């Protein structure tokens, strides 16, 4: 994201699809930016333009012929579920609809990567669920890589395959989502994953005579604890639970 804005790290390199962005000149970097779309917490739509014209805007800058840009913008608005709001202005749209316009605009130049910077932080839970469902669908349908930047762990659980936890500008922990949520190894990872009031030792296996159960793949609907008590002829106590 920093490289897209022409901010480069003080150390290290940034690569995209086999190309080192940190080694590119201005002209080549501008070309690579076309392969990166971005959506934000605030939608940054042009208030004097319709939804259709907002989606056309990046194509206008790239020199795409007007008729071709308009046709693609219509296709993208249909893709994000706003076929009936193309001529609406941002002030006439809900927060979720504005974010869908922003997503369509970010896809206008056919990027390889979509960067989502706190894209659902300003939305209510129901609207957030709809936007996340759309992003998952776009990932599957278009084969586009989606990079999500968020402090909402529920968002990570919902749509991500892998997660990197950053602390003080450094990657503290990285791995598959299920792996990180099941057994975070670092202090910052445990603080992010566990709910307030949860004993951290429960995540490390160091709490005496206690076990942490993780349900996956619909197994939460199975009577696991009840069956265990019947078979072992013993009782268990649930110290804490979360989703």
Summary of predicted features, one role per range:
Residues 41, 143-149, 151-152:
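Conserved H-loop
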